[in-house]
């Protein structure tokens, strides 16, 4: 009798769960799209989900059903190439608390400096697909809208107070907050701001609270902040800085303007760098035209949109579609049909395969060595100065782009590193052994993962040693010598101006 009652109870619970599941999946289909997205995103606020549309509805009452199913993001990396998994990682949607290895070193070592290179956070597309409706994304910051952050309200308030700050060049004329109801092209979104508020909070817990890199008496000389001239990079850097140093004194902030996306400053004259970039672009073109499935996909998408295939390709549709994907917005529809998830998967898969071939051909690697040497040289020289006892620029922040970070990863020899996601961060730490005056070490971390021993300059270092750290000398030698030997040169100038024959 007892077993029978337990069976009936379990049966009733199963029925209730089934009813709730169906309600969660299908009740919101009668709501407006904007409310659908908000409802669905709040089902499990602490558990990131990706809403994949099963039947694409057409715009303007064309009558197709608009159902979605909930797919939990995988907790472990799938064994084979998975474009949706990779796209999820690229979106970097704020979710569960992130684990990181920043600041982890033997307890007897002292942290001397940290240099961080970031990619801006989530942004509105740089390109639109012709004859389609732009993604309906609001770039006005609203703390009550998800994703949000405990510091967001105070951050918004603090950004309106900085009349005394010093900003080079055109940076002073840029808005410090995204502020358009319908985002402008390339504008930072609220998601992008939150991503860097989270980055700053994480770095604060590690570097300020645990290692006391900057004390409460820090001054302008202890901080270095450089940004390109785009509002999305300036705003991303300010968001990270605010969470790192809440309610910072604007008088202590001096933002340097970098006109080049590769941060080459006064060393941008490099003909051979341009040559290898052109060769790499030629490789990309040849690889694309060999992909018959990709071409068929573009042809099909062009028919749906009603434009020539060449015009569709030129609009770089993956940029716009990634915005839809990352924000759980439906893909564009016209009277001829809808761009769907299969189109997206084909283009994203091609991107991933192109990255693999890029590594094999090594043209991009040669470009990367020359493109990144000025910035890596600045990074190494700052470490060497601090190792000698200087106390300036203990925390350096470069707010940049994917085209900044990607060649740095390549130049460092990080073969397994993924293409920089939104709000990606690359960190260089300098450590010192107080018991041995000349013992300085460097750690390299990418999105919280310790990749020091994946770099070409420290791959041969024994990780099983008592001190699993890479000597600073190895990094400085790499920058000052080894980068050029890979190019059959002895200096940056020679590498940039050598003849091909």
Curated annotation (Swiss-Prot):
Keywords: Glycoprotein, Golgi apparatus, Hydrolase, Membrane, Signal-anchor, Transmembrane, Transmembrane helix
Stretches assigned to the Lumenal side: 28-501
GO BP, one annotated term: glycosaminoglycan biosynthetic process
A GO cellular component annotation in the UniProt record: Golgi membrane
Pfam families listed in its UniProt record: His_Phos_2
Compartments, as annotated in UniProt: Golgi apparatus membrane
Glycosylation sites: 328, 377, 488
All ranges on the Cytoplasmic side of the membrane: 1-6
Gene3D superfamilies registered for this protein in UniProt: Phosphoglycerate mutase-like (3.40.50.1240)
EC supergroup of this enzyme: hydrolase
Described function: Responsible for the 2-O-dephosphorylation of xylose in the glycosaminoglycan-protein linkage region of proteoglycans thereby regulating the amount of mature glycosaminoglycan (GAG) chains. Sulfated glycosaminoglycans (GAGs), including heparan sulfate and chondroitin sulfate, are synthesized on the so-called common GAG-protein linkage region (GlcUAbeta1-3Galbeta1-3Galbeta1-4Xylbeta1-O-Ser) of core proteins, which is formed by the stepwise addition of monosaccharide residues by the respective specific glycosyltransferases.
Family: Belongs to the histidine acid phosphatase family.
Protein name: 2-phosphoxylose phosphatase 1
């Amino acid at each position: 009798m007892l077993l029978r009652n337990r069976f009936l109870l379990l049966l009733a619970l199963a029925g209730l769960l089934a009813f709730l599941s169906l309600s969660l999946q299908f009740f919101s289909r009668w709501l407006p799209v904007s409310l659908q997205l908000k409802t669905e995103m709040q089902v499990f606020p602490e558990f990131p989900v990706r809403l994949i549309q099963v039947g694409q509805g057409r715009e303007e009452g064309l009558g197709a059903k608009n159902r979605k199913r909930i797919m939990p993001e995988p907790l472990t990396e799938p064994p084979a190439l998975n474009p949706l998994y990779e796209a999820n990682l690229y979106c970097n949607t704020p979710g569960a608390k992130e684990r990181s290895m920043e600041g982890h070193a033997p307890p007897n070592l002292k942290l001397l400096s940290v240099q961080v290179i970031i990619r801006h956070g989530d942004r509105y597309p740089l390109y639109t697909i012709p004859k389609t409706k732009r993604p309906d994304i609001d770039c006005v910051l609203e703390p009550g809208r998800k994703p949000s952050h405990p510091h967001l309200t105070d951050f918004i308030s603090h950004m309106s107070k900085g009349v005394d700050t010093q900003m080079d060049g055109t940076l002073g004329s840029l808005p410090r907050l995204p502020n358009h109801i319908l985002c402008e092209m390339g504008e930072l979104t609220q998601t992008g701001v939150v991503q860097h508020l989270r980055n700053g909070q994480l770095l604060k817990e590690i570097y300020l609270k645990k290692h006391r890199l900057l004390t409460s008496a820090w001054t302008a000389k202890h901080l270095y902040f450089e940004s390109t001239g785009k509002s999305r990079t300036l705003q991303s850097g300010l968001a990270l800085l605010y969470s790192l140093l809440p309610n910072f004194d604007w008088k202590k902030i001096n933002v340097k303007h970098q006109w080049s996306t590769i941060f080459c400053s006064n060393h941008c004259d490099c003909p051979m760098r341009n040559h290898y970039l052109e060769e790499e672009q030629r490789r990309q073109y040849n690889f694309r035209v060999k992909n018959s499935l990709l071409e068929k996909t573009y042809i099909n998408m062009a028919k749906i949109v009603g434009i020539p295939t060449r015009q569709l390709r030129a609009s770089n549709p993956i940029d716009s579609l990634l915005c839809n994907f990352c924000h759980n917005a439906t893909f564009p529809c016209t009277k001829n049909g809808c761009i769907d998830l299969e189109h997206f998967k084909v283009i994203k898969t091609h991107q991933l395969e192109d990255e693999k071939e890029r590594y094999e051909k090594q043209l991009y690697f040669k470009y990367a060595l020359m493109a990144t040497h000025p910035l890596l040289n600045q990074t190494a020289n700052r470490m060497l100065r601090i190792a000698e006892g200087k106390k300036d620029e203990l925390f350096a922040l470069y707010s940049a782009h994917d085209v900044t970070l990607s060649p740095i990863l390549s130049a460092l020899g990080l073969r397994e590193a993924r293409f920089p996601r939104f709000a990606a961060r690359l960190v260089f730490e300098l450590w010192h052994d107080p018991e041995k005056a000349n013992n300085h070490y460097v750690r390299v971390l990418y999105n919280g993962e310790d990749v020091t021993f994946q770099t070409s300059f420290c791959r041969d270092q024994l990780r099983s040693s008592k001190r699993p750290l890479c000597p600073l000398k190895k990094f400085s030698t790499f920058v000052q010598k080894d980068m050029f030997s890979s190019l059959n040169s002895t200096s940056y100038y020679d590498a940039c101006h050598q003849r091909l024959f």
